[in-house]
UniProtKB/Swiss-Prot annotation:
GO biological process, one term: alanyl-tRNA aminoacylation
EC number of this enzyme: 6.1.1.7
Molecular function as annotated in GO: alanine-tRNA ligase activity; aminoacyl-tRNA deacylase activity; ATP binding; tRNA binding; zinc ion binding
HAMAP family associated with the record: Ala_tRNA_synth_A
Protein name: Alanine--tRNA ligase
Binding site for Zn(2+): 609, 613, 712, 716
Organism of this sequence: Methanoculleus marisnigri (strain ATCC 35101 / DSM 1498 / JR1)
Catalysed reactions, as listed in the record: tRNA(Ala) + L-alanine + ATP = L-alanyl-tRNA(Ala) + AMP + diphosphate
InterPro entries: aa-tRNA-synth_II/BPL/LPL, Ala-tRNA-lgiase_IIc, Ala-tRNA-ligase_IIc_anticod-bd, Ala-tRNA-synth_IIc_core, Ala-tRNA-synth_IIc_N, Ala-tRNA_lgiase_arc, Ala-tRNA_ligase, DHHA1_dom
Superkingdom of source: Archaea
Coiled-coil portions: none
């Protein structure tokens, strides 16, 4: 990026010089004329360890110092956003403070919530997960303290000079010496934007980055700027995007050996006691080694590195044998990681992320299980639930949406799942390891990743179990980082060929369709003009027909002209133009038409859509605030609502959800629909608005049903009373962490109840009792059936015993061989054949009731029952399989049964003779 981007009046007036680092070659600005290095690791080592560069601050003190400083300088303080980025459809977790305002504020679609503003935003980045605890500086969750200004041609807030001046002044306000600060030039790009930036360095540590975002990928009439080989174009907005690392500032203010000692002093001490490592804290050698190790490890890149080689370099640098270094630091690294991970989990679960196998839930489970593994390695006394609760209390439990008790239940549920995974995982890995060992090949990394993604089996367990089976597995030191990186961004669903694509160009040339279904949602008749007609698609100037969208099917109905009538089968939206797929005859441009919407279907869809909102609210009331919509599909007869929940919904909870929903219906609460500016709606209602996805645009349409408010484009009833009864027909566990509620509303619910009543009456009639007596009668019948089943089994055993007395067979080389056709059930065939094999013999039995069933058993090592059954069934036109001692099969050709059994007998005799 051009030098003039960084040649600031402030740098000139304050006596800065621009230099080039002798180590990395990057340009930087400094007040020190003798400085030769940029001041960033690895060009220099950390020199603040044991030598703090700021006045001592804990986390709360440093956060308040920053926010109040910028408030004094005209910035509005904002409350933090959730760590679950529910206002974004491209990422799952909040990764930076600027992510709070992407994409709509940064693109200029909506105004910022304040301008200028300051915020301390908890962020989660898992791309360096394996470095946490090892490097002394990496965290999964960190607070990015920031001040942002959004400059437009009409309103200039401030730009580069004032941003750097504010940075200098803030550093001075917390006891730092601005003369020790270097500003390193570093062009920034990401998320489709770019700009000049400077890294703020002091004591060898980067404590902040000041980004001046003024470029975007969107092509404009301005000449492009090359950033890392990619053309970017000047934006209308010039955005000050700063990020100050709260934890790094605290670390530099304390000069502790690691960032973990500075940020989590009480938690680290607690974990050391829990792991029975507290004696190390009083060991001078330990303190020395940890301090030196942190100082030197800090200048090395942990990610993707061979960890042993890195430790060897650190050991050489501090003159300690590498084995001794590992014995000391590995348990402590796990303590540090647990301290970090439990705080990360406190935010994840406290902000209502539900652990699962998908989306942000996958990432929460990844961190949670990694924490459990390390706690198991250290045989810790503390429970994970207690540690996460302690971290929530440090932050302030009132700052989380989810309550502590629910978080504890979620964690306990996950611990039980993890234990179950470990129990069954060993068997799965053993089978795979034996397979690769037999092929004399290593277990590939792809297999290890699949085992983790599909079964939740940790790589450490894979390596351990595989080694016991004689198979080799190599796990990269950054395994968890690789896994997290592949799951951190939302994957765009693969889209097949859209049949509407052929019409896009034509639709763009047409005026927007007036949406009468919003203005007059309860009307079913309207008049309009045909603007275009092609391929059975009619475009009107206005319409009452609702197009498919948001999980709601389209309206259907008719269009009538003076000469003809056509049927509207489907309605779709293409941009701002609505297309009606019609059958029954062509329409002409300019035709006046009368549209008639199928009233019963329209009302049923409206009832079901509003009922979806009601049911979601009821589920949150019963199950907890963590419940979020994972999907929905409305129908005119039956609808479904998928919700995120950490365990199966019980029958009692299902009844309570249904009752809660119907109470809201009976309250006959008005349904309020408004079009609101996005920023104001988010501030008023929170990000629970986006249950059904994130709509584009400056304004969003909000639908309020009781206490539930969502951004929604669907059609709705006027009051909850118009929904009519809501009947939950069932619940399905469709995937880990997602439950599906199947329901009906209005007349459809009445039909569903009537159908269930009919089934009940039919069942009662079948046993000649009144419906109210059916449960007791069924219980009695079931009890009698169980007794009769026992008696049948007793008699069957007696039959088998009697049959056995008549199955003499023949003896071949001392082995009893019985080959016979029997009039017996399949179960009886197996029982008889097994009895022969248990006595060391060989049996081949068949029965025929149209299809021939074949069973073979072998108690002789030279006779393989599978081979016999496959060949016999092959003659019968079928196939079979099983194990060497018991095999089963079938074939349709009963006419060749005698031939097949004779062939089988001969094969058995040959095997016994060793032929």
């Amino acid at each position: 990026m051009l030098e003039e981007e960084y040649t600031l009046d402030y740098f000139r007036s304050e006596g800065f010089e621009r230099k080039v680092c002798k180590s990395c070659g990057a340009a930087f600005w400094t007040r020190d004329p003798e400085q030769e290095f940029c001041g960033d690791a690895p060009c220099v080592t950390y020199n603040f360890i044991g030598n703090p560069v700021f006045k001592p601050h804990n986390v709360s003190e440093m956060r308040e110092a920053f926010l109040s400083f910028f408030e004094r300088h005209g910035h509005t303080r904002l409350e933090r956003y959730p760590v679950a980025a529910r206002w974004r459809d491209d990422i799952y977790l909040t990764i930076a403070s600027i992510a709070d305002f992407q994409p709509f504020v940064t693109s200029g679609v909506v105004p910022p919530p304040a301008n200028p503003l300051t915020i301390s935003q908890p962020c989660i980045r898992l791309n360096d997960l394996d470095s946490v605890g090892r490097s002394g500086r990496h965290l999964t969750l960190f607070e990015m303290m920031a001040h942002h200004a959004f400059n437009t041609p009409e309103e200039q807030i401030y730009w580069k000079d004032q941003t750097v001046a504010l940075c200098d002044e803030f550093i001075k306000s917390i006891g730092g010496d601005p003369a020790r600060v270097s500003y390193k030039e570093h062009p920034w790009y990401g998320g489709g934007n770019a700009g000049a930036s400077v890294e703020v360095l002091i004591g060898g540590l980067e404590v902040a980055t000041l980004v001046f975002m003024n470029l975007g990928r969107q092509k404009t009439d301005q000449p492009p700027v090359d950033v890392n080989g990619v053309p970017y174009y000047p934006m209308r907005l010039n955005i000050v995007d700063t990020g100050y690392g709260l934890e790094r500032l605290v670390w530099a203010s304390k000069g502790s050996p690691t960032i973990y000692d500075a940020v989590f002093p009480e938690m680290v001490s607690r974990l050391m006691r829990s792991a029975r490592l507290e004696d190390l804290l009083d060991n001078p050698e330990f303190t020395k080694i940890m301090g030196l190790s942190a100082r030197f490890a800090g200048v090395m890149d942990i990610s993707g590195t061979n960890l042993y080689n890195l430790r060897r370099k650190v050991a050489e640098a501090i003159d300690v044998p590498v084995e001794r270094l590992e014995r000391i630091v590995v348990p402590i690294e796990k303590v540090y990681s647990i301290a970090d991970h439990t705080r990360c989990l406190a935010y994840m679960l406290g902000d209502c992320i539900v652990p699962s196998n998908v989306r942000e839930g996958y990432l929460a489970r990844l961190v949670l299980r990694r924490t459990l593994r390390m706690m198991n390695d250290l045989s810790m006394d503390d429970a994970l639930t207690d540690l996460i609760e302690a971290q929530m209390q440090v932050v302030g439990a009132e700052n989380f949406e989810q309550d502590v008790d629910a978080v504890r239940e979620i964690v306990e549920n996950e611990e039980a799942r993890y234990a179950s995974t470990l129990e069954r995982g060993a068997r799965i890995v053993q089978k795979i390891a034996r397979n690769y060992r037999a092929k004399s090949s290593r277990v590939p990394l792809e297999e290890v990743i699949t085992l983790y993604d599909s079964h939740g089996i940790p790589p450490e367990m894979v390596k351990e179990v595989a080694a016991a089976e004689g198979a080799v597995v190599e796990i990269p030191d950054n395994f968890y980082s690789l896994i997290a990186e592949t799951h951190s961004e939302a994957q765009k669903e693969a889209r097949g060929e859209d049949p509407l694509d052929a019409y896009r160009e034509r639709a763009v040339s047409l005026p927007p369709t007036k949406k009468l279904y919003y203005e007059l949602p309860n009307e079913v008749e309207f008049e309009a003009m045909v603007l275009d007609y092609f391929d059975g698609m009619a475009v009107l100037d206005q319409t009452l027909f609702y197009p498919e969208g948001g999980g709601q099917p389209s309206d259907t109905g008719t269009l009538v002209t003076s000469e003809s009538m056509v049927r509207v089968e489907e309605v779709v939206k293409l941009g701002e133009v609505i297309l009606h797929r019609v059958t029954g005859g062509p329409l002409m441009r300019g035709d006046r038409v009368k549209g008639m919407v199928d009233e019963e279907r329209r009302w049923s869809l409206m009832r079901h859509h509003t009922a979806t909102h009601v049911l979601l609210h009821a589920a949150q009331q019963v199950l907890g605030v963590h419940v979020h919509q994972a999907g929905a599909q409305k129908g005119s007869e039956v609808s479904r609502l998928d919700i995120r929940h950490y365990r199966h919904i019980t029958p009692d909870e299902l009844r309570r959800i249904e009752l809660e929903a119907n109470r809201l219906v009976m309250a006959d609460t008005p349904v309020y629909i408004h079009v609101e500016e996005r920023t104001k709606a988010e501030q008023k209602y929170g990000f629970g608005l986006y249950q059904g996805g994130v709509p584009p645009g400056r304004e969003i349409r909000t639908v309020q049903v009781g206490a539930d408010v969502q951004a929604c484009a669907g059609t709705h009833v006027r009051t909850t009373g118009e929904i009519g009864p809501i009947r939950v027909l069932g619940v399905e566990h469709i995937q880990d962490g997602v439950e599906r509620l199947v329901f009906a509303a209005g007349i459809a619910a009445v039909h569903a109840v009537q159908h269930l009543g009919d089934l009940l009456q039919e069942s009662a009639d079948m046993v000649s009792v009144q419906p109210e007596n059916l449960p007791a009668t069924v219980a009695r019948f079931f009890s009698e059936w169980k007794e009769q089943k026992k008696e049948i089994e007793r008699l069957q055993k007696k039959v088998v015993d009697l049959e056995m007395q008549n199955l003499d067979g023949e003896v071949v080389d001392g082995v009893r061989v019985v080959v016979r056709t029997l009039d017996a059930t399949h179960k009886e065939l197996v029982a008889l054949a097994t009895t022969v094999a248990d006595e060391g013999g060989v049996a081949l039995f068949a029965s025929s009731d149209g299809t021939v069933k074949v069973v073979a058993t072998s108690g002789a090592p030279t006779v393989n029952a599978v081979d016999i059954v496959r060949e016999v069934c092959g003659i019968l036109g079928g196939k079979g399989g099983g194990k060497p001692n018991l095999a089963q099969g079938a074939g349709p050709d009963a006419s060749r049964l005698e031939e097949a059994l004779e062939y089988g007998r001969n094969r058995i005799i040959e095997a016994l003779h060793g032929e």
